[in-house]
A protein has these predicted regions:
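Extended, compositionally biased accessory segments flanking or bridging domains
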Residues: 1-76
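Short linear interaction motifs
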Residues: 8-12, 90-101
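Conserved beta-strand segments of the P-loop GTPase G domain that flank and frequently precede/overlap
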Residues: 28-31, 54-58, 78-86, 111-114, ...
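Short acidic, S/G/P-rich loop/turn micro-motifs used as interaction or catalytic elements
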Residues: 33-37, 58-63, 83-90, 117-120
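Short, glycine/charged-enriched secondary-structure capping and boundary segments
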Residues: 43-44, 91-95, 125-129
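Conserved P-loop NTPase "ATPase switch" module shared by AAA+ and STAND
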Residues: 71-92, 96, 105, 109-116
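Arginine/glycine-rich "motif VI" loop of SF2 helicases in the C-terminal RecA-like domain
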Residues: 101-106, 128
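A short helix-turn-beta junction within AAA+ P-loop NTPase domains corresponding to the substrate/partner-engaging
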Residues: 124-139
Length: 139
């Protein structure tokens, strides 16, 4: 899929989420193209900064929930990148699955950038949470 088509899909979905979703929902943005993710980050910083928060999950952090809780701006949809670089992603996903109900305390949707490897792990390690997610397929 070319970048123009990816951009149309991602930003159409993001605009829908911004306009229609006013409670927590987890979305997985499936993309293996780091340059497209960076391009999207730049667009969000320039055009969506008032409504979208972009966070980079540290490679050594073991709790996505705590990371988001400590960094979230509750008035903005949150996008998190960096999961593929996490050194203990299996633990991160297993913990997310166990405490999935606590994520519902967040007021707005969260979008996680994932690649095929992380998506496969999500399905295998956090199936209950995965079944409650929406997917933005950019492959």
């Amino acid at each position: 899929m070319d970048n123009l088509k990816k951009r149309n899909i991602f930003f159409n979905d993001l605009n829908f989420i911004l306009d229609c979703c006013n409670s927590f929902r987890l979305y997985l943005a499936l993309c293996n193209d780091d340059s497209f993710i960076q391009e999207s980050h730049n667009v969000i910083l320039n055009e969506y900064n008032d409504r979208v928060q972009w966070l980079s999950f540290p490679s050594d952090n073991r709790s996505l929930f705590s990371f988001v809780e400590n960094n979230i701006d509750s008035s903005k949809v949150t996008i998190v990148c960096g999961l593929k670089d996490n050194v203990d992603i299996d633990h991160v996903l297993a913990t997310m699955n166990v405490i999935r109900e606590t994520f519902y305390k967040f007021n707005l949707p969260i979008i996680l950038w994932v690649d095929k490897s992380i998506m496969s792990k999500f399905i295998r390690i956090a199936p209950d949470f995965y079944n409650c997610t929406g997917t933005i397929n950019l492959e």
